[in-house]
Amino acid sequence: MKNRVFSLAMLSGSMDDAIIIPFLDGLVEAGYQGVCPHPRNGLKVPYPSRLYWQRLARFIELAQARGLEIWHYDEFPYPSGQLGGVLVEDHPHLASQTLALETITAAPDANGFIDIGRGTLVALARCRLDDKSTFKAIHDVTADTGMHLDSWICNEAHNLGYTATTHIHREDHERAFPKRISRYYAPETPLQDNEILIAIKATPGNANYQGLHKPDLTRPEVTQFFADHIYTQLSQIGAAHHLANTPIFQDEVTFYSSFPWNEEIHQTLRSQWGQEFAGNLLALFNTNIHGWENARFQYRTLCADLLEKNWYITIKEHCHRHQLQMTGHLPGEETFGGHAQIIGNAFKNLRHFDIPGYDIISSTLPDDIDRCHATGIKLVQSAAWIDGRKPTMAEAFGANGFHQDLQRNRTVLAWLGVHDIKQICDHATFSDSRSLTKYDAPPIHNRFNPMHKGAPDLWKWFQWFCDLMDQYQFDPQTLVLFPFDALTLFTLQEKQWKAQTSLLESFFHYLCAYSLDCVFLPSHQLPEVKATADGFIFQGHHFSHFIIPPFSSLHKSTFEALQQWQQLPGFCWVLPEDTTGITLFGEDHPKSTFIPITAAQIKNCSEDELVKTGANWFADMLDSPLHQWQSPRSVIKSLRINPQNQEKLLVIINPHDDPIEITAPYFGAPLPQPPEHCAMEIITEKDISKVLLAPRATAIFRHQKSTSIKINSPTYRTITPEKCQWRIAGDNFWNVKKGNLHLESHTQIPFATKAVSALWTLTPNATHPQFDYHPLPRQLKLEATFPLHLNTIIPSLSLILDLDSMPRGARWFWDEYELPHTIRDIFETQNNVYDIPTSLLTAGAHQLHMSATIENGAQGILERPILQGDFVIAGEYPLHLDRRSHQWQDAKSTFPHWREVGFPEAFGPAEYSCDFIIPDLTTGNILLELPSCIGIAKITLNGQNVGRNNWEPRLIPLPKVLLHDGRNTVQITLHGSWNNIFSRLNYRENGLHQMPVLRVHTP
């Protein structure tokens, strides 16, 4: 069955027929093909009692009678659910634990002993630091710790009235020695001023939703408990209802701790590390410790292996014995601050899932997809391709708001790129969440929509999604090495590592956002890649480029495998952040070795090749900041560099056709480079250095101080005319409904951030573009010409068209010049971007010409052709709200105007206007309360300017001298660089998001 839409049914309430039957009927009516029962908070049937299994069997029976397919999504037995918490309540020794560091500051007592406090001690390290707080020596002194007898609780019979050494009363003894158990360190020699004690202790892991502790999934007895209590019952219900191979969907399996710990991990690492045990544990937290890469690699690998052995393999074998199939989300790992991330080689656990493939989870992503989710999505996508599995999308609509998730998941699809994601639609896909709670029941989950009968908009969206995916064909061109052994990735919650990882992390995020045709290659499969004269072969597929990210450390075997390809065309090793080299680690490297890598060795691609392959990551970081990145909508203001008193390299590539200005308090001299690669001018004003970097040029700087660097890139504004619809009709030609474009000069307005040189207006009665097509047996050649006229020279201009609606392989020309294009993410959709060289933007007549080949009889719509450049928009206002008259009711009352705030489908200034009547000019002062808005708002009263509002909310007084007796008109004109861009997608960020209000203020 194809294109199945499931409802994730929240089993709350009593699960009576009176609730279940209307719910299932509503799903059938709305067009769902399946239902996924999911016990959740608010369930009023004891779980997992016999009554619960009876009610669940009844639910399945009713669903089958209506032709609905059944999956079972049981979060309760998993770590995020309640049953895991109950397990720990009954068996405390099965709770998850995590490592934690504690610096011991207690002074020695009279005997020279140091109190290291309570808690489960794993190791005690005595560390010597240099003047830069770098660890120079670490000694494991755990053997020198023990209980101090004087601190024991004295309630035994022989301690009631005296001790072995003194004859004092019990009360005096307890005052002298409090009732507590503590450990003490007995040093052989006193601590020096440059020495510290660090205790490594095991503490409880994170709690679940209800505050219950979570189980340790590296213990086999935990897995067996879940299997016995849940899977056996599910298999019996499935057999009774002839549901062979009922799928069991696993929720995000995780350690639920940053540094999981138990006896098996302790014993294994103690035997491996010996005398280096305490030092290697400290190295998990701190990169200033010698050998941290190797220690972290061994630790993560051990944890991943235990999770695979004791959870995934055990659960899979149990499911198969009971004719169940296992699938689920990518393992969630809190160590890396994300819902779907990588821990060492735990990514291989995906291969234990049976159906339907690898889940590219979208669920309830935030409005601005964070880099963890985006990278996780891309990695699962690559894993599905590498392993020959089908990508699927579970929880396509999460539980936190159906209509919002409709917008967010379109964003997710954009991140997935061109990876043949139509396969997602060929397999079962969870959809929006429904609660079975009655209307009059207590609000168990306010975010759920109780008794919501179906979702026609979901179904329409899903069908649109299926149709859209028909256009995608995945043909990967670029391999990107993803290092399962470079364990400095995605450590967003660990502040000590963040400075070390931000560069590599941003690089991966950039590739996820912009390199839609790349596949992430696990480092352990590197030997399978074969180099050829024109590219690289992996699993029988050809790749034109192979990108190696800017690693600061690599496993020795990985490094040696890469060295052989350094001179091959298409091979690009991006410059590491540290100029001195790369740290190698491995089994035959007990000590880390620094291997010097020069720029000449690792940067073998020409600048054009870097642009084509997406390796010019820093260039696009001009528009997507390294440390401040939140979404593709962000524009960089400054970039903070912290070299930590070490000389660093800063690589800046200018991808634009105009120079960019770089300003910093200090710049070292640029590295010598051939003139064709570095064209710049350095201007020194007092302590400020300015560098003008020529178009399409690259500069590499040395800098030795922490500095704020300001990079002024061209400010782009994106606009579009009214929606254009080009449709391939049955007569095999393009029918242009609207879309003739015209550019005219315009006077600069006071609040423009740059010189206004042009504006975009529609010419409704202009001649339609001419077309020439040549019928072919199976294909048609499509050509279209658009005349334009520039009354003045403009600084920059780009043509942007949606990939969703572009004819495949379309070529665009500006006059006779073919426009080279890139793929750029403009807000929430991918686009072909055609940059027009500034030398061609002369005043006068021009034409845009498109040439493409299409399938005979195909249908499609080309929406929203966009011009992007340094100009603002004027012309006819795309939005006029109905003007309404209001009478004053109370001099101090607040009354609404602007009955609703709509958002225009076209681009340009949004106008909001309202009429009001003043019966008496002696009324108090009238203030216009304007909410915060994106852009700049210009306010007029009866045609006269009264002020403007920039970003922040404020109260604007309406001058009495401009007020009329009777009718008055207030008009707000909203301009802005982001104003009304893709308004249907970003409706919360366009125009005014709240109603303006007129207030009367009586002194």
Region annotations inferred by a language model:
Residues 3-6, 10, 14-22, 32-36, ...:
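Carbohydrate-binding surfaces of carbohydrate-active enzymes
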Residues 38-183, 199-224:
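Acidic/aromatic-lined carbohydrate-recognition and catalytic surfaces
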Residues 122-155, 159-161, 610-645, 915:
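Catalytic beta-strand/loop cores that center a nucleophilic Ser/Cys/Thr
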Residues 127, 536, 629, 682-684, ...:
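Short aromatic-centered micro-motifs
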Residues 149-239, 686-714, 843-845, 854, ...:
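Extended acidic/polar, glycine-enriched regions
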Residues 643, 910, 931-933:
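C-terminal accessory/binding modules appended to enzymatic or scaffolding proteins
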Residues 804-867, 932-992:
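Beta-strand-rich ligand-recognition modules
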Residues 925-927:
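Repeat-blade elements of multi-bladed beta-propeller folds
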